[in-house]
């Protein structure tokens, strides 16, 4: 997934 509030890819396991 991609987090529009971040410049990184959002990790869903990071919670």
Swiss-Prot record:
The keyword Cytoplasm applies. Its main location: cytoplasm. Keywords: Cytoplasm, Stress response. GO terms for cellular component: cytoplasm. It is found in: Cytoplasm. Induction: By water stress. Forms oligomeric structures. Belongs to the small heat shock protein (HSP20) family. On the 2D-gel the determined pI of this protein (spot N144) is: 6.1, its MW is: 17 kDa. This is Probable class I heat shock protein. It comes from Pinus pinaster (Maritime pine).
């Amino acid at each position: 997934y991609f987090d529009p509030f971040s410049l990184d890819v959002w990790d869903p396991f990071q919670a």
